[in-house]
Amino acid sequence: MALPLRTDTPLTLVPLSWLLGRWEGAGVLGHPARGDSDTRFGQVVEFGHDGRDFLTYTSTTWALDEDGSTTEPLDVETGYWRPQPVDLDTPAPAEGPRPVELEVLLAHPTGVVEVLVGTARGPRIDLSSDVVARTATAHEYTAGNRMYGMVEGDLLWALDVALEGHPLRSYASARLKRVS
C-alpha cells in the first residue's frame, strides 16, 4: 500500500505527512512496575502542522472496561516532531526509502519531559530516548524506545520503557484508525 503523502506541507514534512490527522483506537499496556495485569486503553492521537517545519502531536489515553467503555484518564502527552532536512547530495540507499532523521520533544503531566531521536523510513519510524528530565515528584522513568508504522492503512505503535528500576521492556502498544 502506498503511503498517503501530502504536498501541502513544507518539503521537510512530506516524508511524515502520512501521520497528519486524527487517529483513534485501542491498545494494551502493562509493566511489572505497574502491577501484573494488563490494562486495555482507548487512545486519540492528533498530528498537525501550522506551515512550519515541525508536526504538532497530542496523545490522550483512557482506561477501558470489559465492554470497551472509558473508565478513567490514563495519560496525555504533547509535543513536537522535528524532521531534519534530507541531504539530497548523498546517494539514496539501494533498497528502501531514504531515511529521515527525527527529533521528537514530548511533555507529560506526570513531570516527565523527554527528547527522542531516530529515523523515519517510509511507513516505519523508530525513536529512542536521548534525554529524560523528571521533576522531584515524577515516577522513575529513565528511557524509552518507540516504533510507529502504517499497516493496512492503520497506525500501529509500540513503546518499551525503563521504569522504576526495571530494565527496558515492553510497556504499551495500540492500533489506531485514521478518522480525519
Curated annotation (Swiss-Prot):
InterPro entries: Calycin, Nb(III)_bact/plant, Nitrobindin, THAP4-like_heme-bd. Gene3D superfamilies: 2.40.128.20. A motif (GXWXGXG) lies at residues 21-27. It comes from the Bacteria. Pfam families: THAP4_heme-bd (PF08768). Belongs to the nitrobindin family. This is Ferric nitrobindin-like protein. It comes from Kineococcus radiotolerans (strain ATCC BAA-149 / DSM 14245 / SRS30216). The lineage of its organism: Bacteria, Bacillati, Actinomycetota, Actinomycetes, Kineosporiales.
